[in-house]
Amino acid sequence: MAQQQQQQHQQQQHHQQQQQLLLQQQQQLLQYNNNLYNLNYNMEDNERRKRREREKYERQQGIQSDDRETSLFGEPRRLNPSEGDAEITAALGEFIDARDHMNSSTVGIYRHASTNASSSRLPALSFGGSSLANSYSTSSASVNPAASLASSSASVPGQLPTSQQQQQQQQQQQHYQQQQRAPTYLKQADNKPPYNGRGGYPGQPMKNDIPSSSGMAPPRGPPRSSSSASQSNSNSNSINSSSATNNATSGATSASMSSPLGPPLSTQMPNGREKSFLGPPAPALPNGGRFVPPAASSKRPSNSVGLQPPPPEKDISKIITEMTNNYRVTPLTSIAATPHAPMSENYNLNGPNKFKYAFDSIGPLNSPPAAGASSLMTPLLAPIAPITSPIAPLLTTPPQASQLPLPLAPLAGATTVPPALGGMAAVAPIQQLMPTPPKASPTPPAIKPMKTEKNHSLEKQDSCLENDLELSESDDERKKEGRSAGNSSNSSESDSSESGSEASSKGDTQQQQQQQQQQQQQQLLLQQQQQQQLLLQQQQQRLAASANGSKKKYSQTIIASGANTISGLLTSSGLGGAGAGSVAGGAGGAGGAINATNNTCGGGGGSSGSCMGTMSSSSSSNKTPSPTDSNRWNLSRFFPKPANQTAAESVSPGVANAIGNVSMKVPGILPGGAQIIPESIDVTTAIVKNEKLHDEPRHVGDDEDDEADEQHRQQQQQQQQQQQQQQQQQRYGLSVTVKKEQLEQQQQQQLLLQQQQQLTTEQLALAGALPKNQIKRESRLSDSGSASSGSGSGSSSSDSAGGSSEVLQMPGPGETLQIPGVPAAITTVLRVPQAMQHKVQPNSVTLTPIGPLPASPKPRQKKPRKKKMSAATAPLDSSDEDEPTASSNKKHALELAATAAAAAAAVAVPVAAAAAPAIKKGRGRPRKQAQQQQQQQQQQLQQSGNLSSASASSSQAKGPTLTAAKKPLAKASVSNSNSTAPATVAAGTRKREHSSNSSSNSNTPTKKPTATFATMAAKLDRADALSSDDDSSSSSSCSSTKSSSSSGSDSETPAAAAAGAAASTATTVVTTSAQNPAKKRIVKINKVGVAGNSSSSSKAKRRYSVGSSSNSSSSSETEEQQQHKQQQLLLLQQQQQKQQLQHQQQLQQQQQQQQSLLGQFAAESLPQSAQRLSSSDCSSSSNSDSSSNSSGSSSSSDEDGEHRSGKRKSDKKKICTLTRIFNPKEGGAKKQGQVVIIDQSEEQQQQQQQQQQQAKELKPRATPTQLLGATLASPARTTTPHLTSLMCKIDLSKLARQHHHQPERLKAQQNGHLSSRSAEGARTPKDLQQICTPNGYVGGAAGGGAAASKLLGGVKHEHGVKPEPELEPGYEGKYKLNSVKQEFMLKQELPARRRKRSSSSSSSPYKEKKRKKEKAEQLSKELLPVPVLLPANNHERLSRDKLELLMQQQESAANGSPNKLQQQQQQSRLSQSQQQQQQQQQQQSLSQSTTAAATVAAAPIQLPTTCSEAVQTTPPPAAPQPEPRLIYRSHFDKEEENENDDLRKNDFLLQEAIRRKRAADSERDSFSQMTLYLEAIVYFLLTADAMERCNMEATWTMYKDTLSLIKYISSKNRPYQLSTNGNHESHNIVAILSLRCQSLISLKLYKLRRVNCRAIIASCTEFFRSGRGDILNGNTPSSISPSNSVGSQGSGSNTPPGKIVPQDIHNMLCKQNEYLTYVNSAHELWDQADRLVRNGNHIDFIRKLDHENGPLTLHSTMHEVFRYVQAGLKTLRDAVSYPQSQ
């Protein structure tokens, strides 16, 4: 006994000595901290204030000083943290952790360690080397009486430590330390929070309820001593952790206890903020307190058990083992960086991989590690287990943990659950967190401080934004917390940190307790679910492995490890087959797969699985942030998890990785929430930034590779889809799968069916993530390519994202969200019923939605040129997709669309072989071997299932839009009703269109006729099908945004033509167009000969049938319309044939080539509009368009020479229009003079045509090259004699847009929005007298399409005409009923080229054409240099041409026969001029009515009678026609568009806005950041606009906060505006758009308060009028003694004369000033923007943007602002990302 007592006494003495050493060390540390604080906080108030202000300003400006960062923040942080930073912090963290671990373990402080473990580790304390660790242990002990086991025991040698003794000891230590502190810092604890509670003095307790601020300025006051903290908060580690975080020691303990992942307590400010001191606290806490040494808890248990002799040195070996295990387990891998990537930064979706390592959800930490969570992790678990169990309770209390706004359930749950689950269970999740051992070793609550830390740095910057917007991310956090405990910690923490985890710090203890309970429950669930998920994931991983095994070598392999969630995300992202296997796990990944989403496709579900580009071109699919982007997974937070999804599911992504050995090469989320993002994944990275790069090499370099990839993808997709269907049928796979070149039609159909089955709300929800991914890409690249394929599934993923039922209720599976002003990815193609797609014949091309957000850079378009050579499908994609790397994107898009379209158009696939899309190498150049290539490509298309999927993917790139229903360009034979040769040509043209469109913001592919080897009949059929398809697509999209959808269909028309699938595909297009939001560009369906093999009748039928049947609804109408139109067409064709047989053959040759393109486009535009129209509308449009359609069909059917001649008349008008449009002098065709009009006297032309008609053989249409060559050879009068139709390469996008909008069906569809600028419309043949629109705008929409195709014969394609800004589909209908043509005409400054436009604009019906014939020479001579001056205003640019077009349509409907037209043309010049004037007047009236009706009457533009006159470089003699009369479009015309708002979209829009803002917060590139911010702004505006119908006050708040946000953003952009770097112009344009937005927001704020302002003005007016109020004279005392009067002086004696204003009046005046200030600001900001446009020489850019999207005025709605800004940003991204391809 005596010996035992002696031993005990010795032990006690030893402990006392150790404690004394620890106290000394603590004192030293405190003194050191005090010195640091003295440096930082002992400054004078003024100095501190100045410094805080300066730092705040710097943070706002994105300026960061390293020294200041180091002193202010736990780790240097950037607004856009870099991966390098993450690595550095991770490396430091590990080192610190190791050091801390060694110190603490040597000291023997294991707070949670069992008594045995602690006792075993106590001997380490005996070593002097562990002084630091001892100091930590003492501080920790002092902080928490429960935790101060070791310290108290050591302090009382002879007694077992009691909480009182411990407290006393702690108090003594604190006093001792405080005495040593400099008196300057010492402030007696008066229970008053210093600095209003912002900071605490060392001895001063902190208010625990003070929310941790984002830390704009470091808290004031010296760091609290650990002893003082322990005294004041001896019982609550949470309070101390927040208040005493400044003390390295106390902070260390509290941090270790409260939150292992939290920032070092020393770095935390007394008020709970993170001071982020890296230096001095580090010695105390190796990680600056962020990571509690795992050994810290060992000492505690020994104390609790009782004083025991220090364990033998063998514990040191244990410590070393633990060190090795822990730190080996958490190397500086992506996981290791986690501690530095706290949840708070998770919201930075675009943030660099710095956050890769951040644990997506803390909750998962508690969840048992996924199978093989990491073999490395496991060793940590054993040592950690003891730690975690004790820590868990502590974690609940520490304010740091509470600081995490998220319910710590996931965080604390990790530690808390361990007690419930057992130390090991808890440990396992921690181990997963352990990737940074410091995090793991401390309890997960430390994670909160971690997040808060990041939150501070990011949040300091975000706080301005998010707080200004009052996004109430805390609400988001709550919602997220509700979703699943596992994910809640992840999302809520990041959100809370984002929202500025200030409020979250309140009630931390309660939250922690609740969280612990939740965590325990969640952990149990997680364990169960993880076990299940491990099985599923293993299976899925196998599937993913197979999928990855396929040639899909891009991120698929990476994603494969992601197992369920990743594969599911990939599938949902539309990576269809390739990613399907990997996606299988997490189809609904939005919820549980959120983490997986992070891994898979950056940003919640990789949205559209773009992350790995599982689609044929993974790179393109990776438009969405690649998994390498650590922040990508953060997007998942925004996606509501499936209700059934448990927290375990959230862990599942990590589990997938955990299942096997943790592979750092495979993206995944460990159970702890740590995300493994392989940085080495080039595919993902490349995909993110240069999708086209990956795709292009494949497309350009290796068609075989593409095919092989496609085959692999197809196989993978099939397998994956099957698996997914089995696992999750609801998972939406993209309706479009990977290219299925080799897949059979049945396989395609099956895939489509599977995909459709998979199209579910979850899929849509996942798609919601797609915009996020696209956002990141959009910042750097136009998202066109990767977004399209990435969205390939494209459109479905982003569409589903836009329309995901979870995120946003979708109008229908095939419908678009149809946000009135939103061209963005709001439509969901995924939901398109397969039946619809199957109904659409495979020849049809799906719509390419106009993605408002992603702007495919034009450079990519150039790249598509290369790719175009490699594959025909690529060209289609490029045109569809709006990205410069169209070809790469094209492949993906084609693959995606091919997948969906292959199934839908399985029947068409065989047909597709018949026609091969003519591929154009250059943007404007057709391939010389277009026909052969087309044939080959068509065959390839059959194999690869090339659909207009490219357009679909491109639409996604442009924004979530419908993708297609595009069907593989299956063109069995030209003769077949499904003859698709023209379609393939259309595909080629579509590429061109895409390239040009990509240049323009909307995806309005420049439609360029490509020579089609197909026969005339096929061309005619195609033209009809195309026109009908375009109409249908435009009409369907018109529902949301008629004009945009119309132009979208127009833009896609080439793709449809390229698809050139059977006319029946029009239904698909219609469906897709319906799906497409109005804003989105619809890919025109190339309906080749659906209705009739006979060229004329079947053409008419097809056109009408396609137009009407493009949608199931229009199918019934199509029959009637087809019959009616066929009759009209027959009549018109007969007349035209009689009259224009002469013009036929040459025109036929050229037109056959061009008609295959333009005709298809025109036809497509017609059917699309018809689709939109109700059956009655369709029938009426067909009736009105009957003449135009007949002419169009005749033109489209090259077989009908008569029809051609008839159309040629209209073609003359169109040629005139086109000539003006395309004459470089007139500014047409980008002022490149790309349109060559053959201008011969009509008589000569007629003679030639007669001769040709005599030789009436249908000559194969010249290849685009031939046409171009002919045109180039003789621009004025090359080949076609009478046909004045331009042989020009008219921007198909322009014409197609117009043509789409022109169909009379469009009248009803467009609601007065005439956006019928399509290549077809421009080329409307004479037969389409009604349709003939001078600018190629479809006068009669249906007829216009056919006429346009005829014009193509007459028009040579020199260079793809770049789509004019007006061509934007979204805006065309809206802004340009006929004005688009006018604008083009006006835009083309052809002073030399005889702006016959002016006459043409005045030209009403074909009477003008007669006049033109008579006046041809005179007019050509007189008007040679007559340039049509573009009015300064875009509205002014709407020229009389619109009216003329309307008149022409009406007249053509009335005067359907070409004979009448010719007669009218034969009328005397006087009569013609009179008629023109009258017609112009009529047209104006009509335009007013039709504008509302959205009918586009193609008024024959009085142009030089011959095309040559219009086209000639030297102005040919042109009869002076009445000067162009500007048509001013009323802004009331566009009001109809915005009536379609769906309140269901409010939440989706808000989520999109938040995603983009967070992505911008983490973006490092200034330009990308500004564009993302601006995108977020417009989404906020759409949200506010939608809210306006419900809650005016909330709307006011939203607008006001948005204004504050945009002002803040603009302030950050100012330094770049004046810079001279290459981005100078782009930054200036961003500033212009920002100023426009600010102006309109200010005006909106005034309008919202206009009623109040009126009342105030009335009251104030009454007050001043009545003279109420006492008048104060300077010398006369007033009845009321002035406040400033001096007693000695007479009252008022010193008061200046004035009037006393009552308080109520004063308040009203203040309010009035506020409201009127908004008005003043609106105009002032608008003027600033105008000045910046002029001074910066951005007039051309803005003018183009106005033309394409409609002018932005103070009358513009928020939807229009959205479209306009999105289009501008898209164009900017294209220019910045791909300047070379511009």
Swiss-Prot record:
Name of this protein: AF4/FMR2 family member lilli
Keywords: Developmental protein, DNA-binding, Nucleus, Pair-rule protein, Phosphoprotein, Transcription, Transcription regulation
InterPro entries the record matches: AF4/FMR2, AF4/FMR2_CHD, HMGI/Y_DNA-bd_CS
Primary localization: nucleus
Regions of compositional bias (Polar residues) in chain numbering: 623-634, 973-982, 1308-1318, 1450-1460
Phosphothreonine found at: 443
Family: Belongs to the AF4 family.
Known role: Has a role in transcriptional regulation. Acts in parallel with the Ras/MAPK and the PI3K/PKB pathways in the control of cell identity and cellular growth. Essential for regulation of the cytoskeleton and cell growth but not for cell proliferation or growth rate. Required specifically for the microtubule-based basal transport of lipid droplets. Plays a partially redundant function downstream of Raf in cell fate specification in the developing eye. Pair-rule protein that regulates embryonic cellularization, gastrulation and segmentation.
GO biological processes: periodic partitioning by pair rule gene; regulation of cytoskeleton organization; regulation of DNA-templated transcription; regulation of lipid transport
DNA-binding region positions on the chain: 920-932
Gene Ontology MF: a single term: transcription coregulator activity
Comp. bias intervals (Pro residues): 435-447
Positions bearing Phosphoserine: 472, 474, 878-879, 949, 951, 1457
Residue ranges with Acidic residues bias: 465-475
Chain intervals with Basic residues compositional bias: 859-869
Biased composition (Basic and acidic residues): 54-80, 450-463, 691-701
GO cellular component: nucleus; super elongation complex
Compartment(s) of residence: Nucleus
